[in-house]
């Protein structure tokens, strides 16, 4: 596979996993400059974009690249301005990536896993994250003595990964010889599958079970993966029985993770479950002010106020808006004002009717309307009282979100994409033939948009 083919596939996956705004603004036009020495050099247009991507998207891009090429490399974003100095240091000819022979090569338990910017010192505390921050700090100070496991859940871009990295940094600062692993459930799954294929399951288990702290991100992705759940169940048990700390993150609480074995769900609930909610106005302003201080930027308070008022969904999009503004100002050659800020962000400012809708939002509203439990949308039950609302929720998921058909199917218990297509066609036909039902669906859509 050529480097161009690799990067085309990476971008294809990134478009599914990263918000459309962030993908279009920062990821879409990136180029793979080189792939060698366990490092992927990725070219972007502006230095600030490179800095922001290295801080915020390194982990997710690392996981995506791993999924494509089958071995781990560290992504490093550089701007065109930095390219000359990079070439001076790295004069070797770019080589085609070579597949490594072992999936269990990485024995690094150190700080190299963690984003250097994601520490407790850089975490801005507000009402929506005060409790998760306190719980994370307690775990980092005394692993396996405070809350075990610690389960952190909340929407995308609210700081779950930041807290997990902060825990890793803190543990290793206090105990440099501690064995700490940070991974995602997708990476855990991929390594597990590869270990079976390469007959290296014992090495895989040694890696994940003979450690002091396990930090595992996005655990919801192990739903429907029976063998992975079985493996993680035994990994969890061994770590917990040996008094080792486990920290788990998810976009939803354990009880709402469909197709999760009950024995795993109950173990996730053994310790402390904390949720992170979107930041309030004061927290959003504090985040922006901290960011411009870190980057030594000069931005008028009224411009920050505009961003904080308009971007309310999550921290990632808040910082993304700031990055977009800086890029727009530089490319236009104009000073930053409130007017320029509005102009720069006009394509990403979300009105109440165009705010980002999740499949969970849709399931919640449809479930309440038809008296269907959230977990029943993912169950195998085919009674009409459940199956028909499920089809309505699938229809609305396709109409109101940008998620792919496989992703929608995954959120409804791992159903095939053809099931989603059938549901959409059926509900669309029923809407055409039944004016009363059409009004019912329109009311549901209005309620979903106004959440």
Swiss-Prot record:
Coiled-coil blocks: none
Annotated spans, Domain I, interacts with DnaA modulators: 1-71
A GO molecular-function annotation: lipid binding
Binding site for ATP: 157, 159-161
Subunit note: Oligomerizes as a right-handed, spiral filament on DNA at oriC.
GO biological process: DNA replication initiation; regulation of DNA replication
Gene3D superfamilies xrefs: 1.10.1750.10, 1.10.8.60, 3.30.300.180, P-loop containing nucleotide triphosphate hydrolases
UniProt xrefs under InterPro entries: AAA+_ATPase, Chromosome_initiator_DnaA, Chromosome_initiator_DnaA-like, Chromosome_initiator_DnaA_CS, DnaA_C, DnaA_dom, DnaA_N_dom, DnaA_N_sf
Pfam families associated with the record: Bac_DnaA, Bac_DnaA_C, DnaA_N
Key words of the record: ATP-binding, Cytoplasm, DNA replication, DNA-binding, Lipid-binding, Nucleotide-binding
Primary gene name: dnaA
Stretch list, region Domain II: 71-112
Signal peptide: none
Annotated localization: Cytoplasm
UniProt region (Domain III, AAA+ region), positions on chain: 113-329
Similarity annotation: Belongs to the DnaA family.
Top-level taxon of origin: Bacteria
Domain notes: Domain I is involved in oligomerization and binding regulators, domain II is flexibile and of varying length in different bacteria, domain III forms the AAA+ region, while domain IV binds dsDNA.
Function: Plays an essential role in the initiation and regulation of chromosomal replication. ATP-DnaA binds to the origin of replication (oriC) to initiate formation of the DNA replication initiation complex once per cell cycle. Binds the DnaA box (a 9 base pair repeat at the origin) and separates the double-stranded (ds)DNA. Forms a right-handed helical filament on oriC DNA; dsDNA binds to the exterior of the filament while single-stranded (ss)DNA is stabiized in the filament's interior.
Protein name: Chromosomal replication initiator protein DnaA
Record organism: Staphylococcus epidermidis (strain ATCC 12228 / FDA PCI 1200)
GO cellular component: cytoplasm; plasma membrane
């Amino acid at each position: 596979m050529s480097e161009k083919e690799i990067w085309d596939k990476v971008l294809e996956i990134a478009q599914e996993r990263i918000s459309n705004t962030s993908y279009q603004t920062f990821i879409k036009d990136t180029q793979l400059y080189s792939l060698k020495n366990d490092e992927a050099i990725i070219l972007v247009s502006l230095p600030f974009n490179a800095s922001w991507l290295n801080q915020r998207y390194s982990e997710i891009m690392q996981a995506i690249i791993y999924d494509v090429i089958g071995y781990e490399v560290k992504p490093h974003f550089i701007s065109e301005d930095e390219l000359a100095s990079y070439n001076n240091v790295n004069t070797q000819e770019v080589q085609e990536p070579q597949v490594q022979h072992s999936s269990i090569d990485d024995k690094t338990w150190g700080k190299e896993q963690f984003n250097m910017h994601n520490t407790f010192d850089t975490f801005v505390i507000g009402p929506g994250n005060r409790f998760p921050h306190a719980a994370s700090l307690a775990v980092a100070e005394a692993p396996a003595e405070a809350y075990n496991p610690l389960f952190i859940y909340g929407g995308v871009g609210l700081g779950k990964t930041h807290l997990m990295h902060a825990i890793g940094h803190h543990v290793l600062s206090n105990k440099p010889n501690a064995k700490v692993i940070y991974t995602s459930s997708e990476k855990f799954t991929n390594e597990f599958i590869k270990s079976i294929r390469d007959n290296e399951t014992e090495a895989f288990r040694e890696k994940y079970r003979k450690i002091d702290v396990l930090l595992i991100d996005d655990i919801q992705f192990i739903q429907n993966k029976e063998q992975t759940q079985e493996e993680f169940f035994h990994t969890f048990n061994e770590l917990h029985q040996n008094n080792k700390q486990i920290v788990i993150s998810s976009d939803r609480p354990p009880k709402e993770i469909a197709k999760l074995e009950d024995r795993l769900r109950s173990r996730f609930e053994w310790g402390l479950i904390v949720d992170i909610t979107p930041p309030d106005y004061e927290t959003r302003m504090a985040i922006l002010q901290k960011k411009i201080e870190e980057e030594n930027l000069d931005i008028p308070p009224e411009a920050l106020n505009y961003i904080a008022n308009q971007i309310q969904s999550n921290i990632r999009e808040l910082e993304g808006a700031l990055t977009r503004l800086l890029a727009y100002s530089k490319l236009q050659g104009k000073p930053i004002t409130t007017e320029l800020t509005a102009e720069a962000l006009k394509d990403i400012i979300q009105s109440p009717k165009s705010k980002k809708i999740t499949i969970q939002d849709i399931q919640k509203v449809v479930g309440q309307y038809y008296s269907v439990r959230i977990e029943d949308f993912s169950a195998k039950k085919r009674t009409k009282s459940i199956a028909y609302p499920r089809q309505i929720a699938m229809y609305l998921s396709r109409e109101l979100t940008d998620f792919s058909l496989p992703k929608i199917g995954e959120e409804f218990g791992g159903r095939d994409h053809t099931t989603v297509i059938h549901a959409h066609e059926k509900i669309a036909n029923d809407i055409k033939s039944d004016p009363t039902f059409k009004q019912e669906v329109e009311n549901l859509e209005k309620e979903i948009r106004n959440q």
